[in-house]
Amino acid sequence: GQSFFDRAEIRDLCAWLRLWVNSDDDPAFLRAVTTPKRGIGHTTLQQLGVFASKYRLSLFEALFANSLGAALPQRAISSLHEFGRFVNDLEYRARHTEGAEDAQRFLTDWLRDIGYERHLYDSEDNEKLAAARWNNVLEFCQWMAQRCGGQIDDTAGVTMTSEKKSLLEVAQTISLLSTLNERGDEQNVVTLSTLHAA
């Protein structure tokens, strides 16, 4: 079947997770900063890219460079700084969030803060399809929360328990699987059953 990570909504969320794990991941940065839209336009991102390339910085590092003010208007810099602080705050909180209940609360708040459900419904003409995509998001977040709580379903569907993990540790596993899947390794397609075994 279709890889779980090939679904656009899961790729969107994985971009955010990858950015928490590695802020130098430029493709993840670009997807997260534009999905859902945050008022940071193509021109701003293009100028940021030129600046980052010139100084050999990742896009995220470039956000906080002192000399960025000479390359971008103040309004654009303010929006970029706001995004950067938001990502840093999420990473810090994910590092300190353990257990299924706290992880579920964190993920629910995060999806609300970025307006992801509204984004899905606004970008999808078919409401049933939008609802199905939102259900995929909820299933993915529930799985992450269970992993934080130490619950793992093996491939036979038997629930096993292990030690609790921080949300950032779970994000690291997902980030790795997502990156491998994005590289298009045909014989190693990541499916939901692979996720359950991870």
Predicted regions and their residues:
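Conserved RecA-like ASCE P-loop NTPase motor core of nucleic-acid helicases/translocases
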Residues: 1-4, 13
